Amino acid sequence: MTTTLQQRSGASSWQAFCEWVTSTNNRLYVGWFGVLMIPTLLAATICFVIAFVAAPPVDIDGIREPVAGSLIYGNNIISGAVVPSSNAIGLHFYPIWEAASLDEWLYNGGPFQLVVFHFLIGIYAYMGREWELSYRLGMRPWICVAYSAPVAAASAVFLVYPFGQGSFSDAMPLGISGTFNYMLVFQAEHNILMHPFHMLGVAGVFGGSLFSAMHGSLVTSSLVRETTETESQNYGYKFGQEEETYNIVAAHGYFGRLIFQYASFNNSRSLHFFLAAWPVVGIWFTALGVSTMAFNLNGFNFNQSILDGQGRVLNTWADVLNRAGLGMEVMHERNAHNFPLDLAAAESTPVALQVPAIG
């Protein structure tokens, strides 16, 4: 009898935990994806803060030239970063127990892998948690679909690009200046500005900003007045009210006359779908572009493509961009013995003039 009661008590405790995890009445929804998200994002955040403040220099290139990224080694908020793991580690999984000592783990940039892997698992779980909450509330699943765009971008720079280049040392550093350095090196090595997927991403981000500003200003300019001249118009809205808070007909008429009739949406649902889809698709293409350039399927090359009647080169902006890329490539290679191959002007000298006969 005692054993039976203990089993029922244990079962009821587990059932209570399951109901709490999946309850939509909590102030913050947890969900089963949240059970995975919370510890992974906490681990990533704690390790990032400690490494950003106090991590020792990391031998990022694997040539015994450590790069300092933490605050206590002289960096500030702008220049500081969690430096990627060493090129000597390559793509190997490098947890703490794989190193001979904690000092070795820190010297080879182990904290970077710890932060990135926990962060990626955390944002994947956050996306799943968005779907889970939508499912529990009977909503459609497009919120997690929209969130998949930044998730794809983070996966591209932290996971796919290192896989394509053969080392986690090529991943994006976790810092402001490190991000800029990553962008400059990416342009130098892959000519990303001439890649059509990057162009689509720029159109998505800037176009989304433009459309968001246009939509917000149109709505704000066509609010239905419910207050006096001396009160804020925001007091004219009550949460959950059934009436429209702005006059979509007036906004449609204004914008249709400002541009042309068919440039304005007359359907609020299709309008908001467009506002969501435009930047999401653009960022998807950017992530896809970074993922293809990870395997050296680079941007277009129009260098020295225009010649005059005598065969002399007429420089274009493509040539200016190429010269800038060469300069960035030189600055990127800190060690002289690893001179970039695409800058070598002379023919390589063979080690052996002829293959020796065997036997």
Swiss-Prot record:
Residues given in the record as chlorophyll a PD1 binding sites: 198
EC number: 1.10.3.9
Keyword tags: Calcium, Chlorophyll, Chromophore, Electron transport, Herbicide resistance, Iron, Magnesium, Manganese, Membrane, Metal-binding, Oxidoreductase, Photosynthesis, Photosystem II, Thylakoid, Transmembrane, Transmembrane helix, Transport
Membrane topology: Multi-pass membrane protein
Cofactor note: The D1/D2 heterodimer binds P680, chlorophylls that are the primary electron donor of PSII, and subsequent electron acceptors. It shares a non-heme iron and each subunit binds pheophytin, quinone, additional chlorophylls, carotenoids and lipids. D1 provides most of the ligands for the Mn4-Ca-O5 cluster of the oxygen-evolving complex (OEC). There is also a Cl(-1) ion associated with D1 and D2, which is required for oxygen evolution. The PSII complex binds additional chlorophylls, carotenoids and specific lipids.
Chain sites annotated for binding Fe cation: 215, 272
Binding site for chlorophyll a ChlzD1: 118
Residues given in the record as [CaMn4O5] cluster binding sites: 170, 189, 332-333, 342, 344
Prosequence residues removed at maturation: 345-359
Compartment annotation: Cellular thylakoid membrane
A GO cellular component entry from the record: plasma membrane-derived thylakoid membrane
TM annotation in the entry: 29-46, 118-133, 142-156, 197-218, 274-288
Protein's GO biological process: photosynthetic electron transport in photosystem II; response to herbicide
Keyword rRNA processing attached: no
Any further remark recorded for this protein: Cyanobacteria usually contain more than 2 copies of the psbA gene. 2 of the reaction center chlorophylls (ChlD1 and ChlD2) are entirely coordinated by water.
Cited function: Photosystem II (PSII) is a light-driven water:plastoquinone oxidoreductase that uses light energy to abstract electrons from H(2)O, generating O(2) and a proton gradient subsequently used for ATP formation. It consists of a core antenna complex that captures photons, and an electron transfer chain that converts photonic excitation into a charge separation. The D1/D2 (PsbA/PsbD) reaction center heterodimer binds P680, the primary electron donor of PSII as well as several subsequent electron acceptors.
Similarity remark: Belongs to the reaction center PufL/M/PsbA/D family.
Identification of the protein by name: Photosystem II protein D1 3
Organism of this sequence: Parasynechococcus marenigrum (strain WH8102)
Organism phylogeny: Bacteria, Bacillati, Cyanobacteriota, Cyanophyceae, Synechococcales
